[in-house]
Amino acid sequence: MVKVLQLCFLSAISLVQALNSTVDQKDEAKVDINTVFDNDSTNFCRMDKTEAIGATCDVTFHEINEVNNNIRPQLLSLVQSDFFKYFKLDLYKECPFWSDNNGYCVNRACAVDVVEDWDSLPEYWQPEILGNIENATTDITDDECSFLDELCDKPRFEAEKDIEYCDTNDFNSQHSVLVDLTANPERFTGYGGEQSSQIWSSIYKENCFSLGDENQCLAKDAFYRLISGLHASIGTHLSNEHLNTETGKWEPNLELFMTRVGNFPDRVSNIYFNFAVVAKALWKIRPYMNELGFCNAYNEDVKGMIDGVVSQLNSKVFNEDLLFHDEVSGQLKDDFRIRFKNVTKIMDCVQCDRCRLWGKVQTTGYATSLKILFEMDNDDDVARQHVVDKLTKYELIALFNTFDRLSKSVEAVNRFEEMYNYQLKSPGEKLASFFQLDNFFKVLNDKFNSANHSSQEKESVSNVEKKVNEFNDLKMPEKKKETHTEVREQASGVFKEAWDVEWKNFKQALRFIVTSYTDLPSTVSKYTVLKLNKLWNKFIGVPNYLEEGEELEYPSYNYEE
């Protein structure tokens, strides 16, 4: 095995040296780096940024980038304010779809720090006033006069239909806890594997609608793009906040981003699509913001930041009227609502607490957006106000935090694009990133270094600092012949040591078998005498012989040795 690794490593060295010599000889021949790395294998943002995002959007990628650059500072300050940085959820709610509890994340990065010092919170976050704050029309009182006044002055909404796209009862659960989102940032936790794949597989399977009408294509496409955009946005966040094990810092990881998002233009496009959806919801609810009861808790600075963000949005970013516009589409809208509600419930199956937290925040934010877009489609202002009155403070908090997450994703996508283009402009950097991405040469180098570790300690290495295009991660032995000989000798020593261990184990096993056979006659004879003695005493009339006399001592064996 060592020889195989050695040969593979030597082949890798030859390839690297050949590539380096080709790049360094600029006067003799120039290499077009795109011939080594075909552009078809790297699909980062291969789209026309001047085109519209989709059939339901009248906005381009470039326009969203400009809007995001303008609102990003105020939006970041807004979600870090006292009102918008807290969220309430049940971290221990059981999964309603399956009972697989084998995927718990025991990593510290998966944990969530909940709020315990309530005295440090503002007044509107104290326990006695937490919960839904609704309009007076929804308050239930025992005062008959108040009830009659309400009937006379306010419209009645009989047979009220379900307009919820998420389970709002979770906010009032006795098991729910308050969490500071700024103290629990969304970042890479190491959670994944089969359990994570099961979560996303179940979410994507919700895109199976019962109706077969051709008009549902736009709705199905919108549903899929929402889920895909959510998935891609989360992947972007985790790639942007990835732990560098060498420096111990959280920093962008271009390779991880390209693997999850960058090599798939449709995923990048769906992030922008989700940005447009949530932006349209914020634009649509703007006229009613001051009429929300809990909005009185804002200070003037927060109100100014909200207006500063929402005022830069417009209605053309998303046209929800194209999705549901007739009776058949009304049934499709109910199916759409139920299925997205299931998506929010699937987040209760996530076994990583921090992943569940941000999954709940973002799915609740999307659910709130859909409720605003699809349920406020009536021209009646009173009916619109009724929908607004059904909003809770946690839905509004989730809405703005989800918009912040999408804004962060758009910002990160542009940063990753700059990093990607920077590597393309430098041939040495591009070659180095290629080998680091595959990690093949790094594995070979680690195997080779572990085999000749003792020989490398004896060698003195000069010229420690080299250029990046000289492949610093490949440690070239200076004396190949001597190093190969020493490696061969050490490999022989390792083989001899392994042989000695196996031979010792074989002798011990053989000794055990032989001893068992040699002791068999003695063991059988003792057992026979014991049985005959018991039968004889029973024959001569000694009752309960073994119980009345001393107990016989059986030979003891230590099975743990």
Swiss-Prot record:
Any idea of its EC number?
A: 1.8.4.-
Return the broad EC class.
oxidoreductase
Its BP terms in the Gene Ontology are: protein folding in endoplasmic reticulum
Tell me a Gene Ontology molecular-function term this record carries: FAD binding
- Catalytic residues at C352 (nucleophile), C355
Function, as annotated, reads: Essential oxidoreductase that oxidizes proteins in the endoplasmic reticulum to produce disulfide bonds. Acts by oxidizing directly PDI1 isomerase through a direct disulfide exchange. Does not act as a direct oxidant of folding substrate, but relies on PDI1 to transfer oxidizing equivalent. Does not oxidize all pdi related proteins, suggesting that it can discriminate between PDI1 and related proteins. Its reoxidation probably involves electron transfer to molecular oxygen via FAD. Acts independently of glutathione.
Q: What is this protein called?
A: Endoplasmic reticulum oxidoreductin-1
The protein's gene is named ERO1
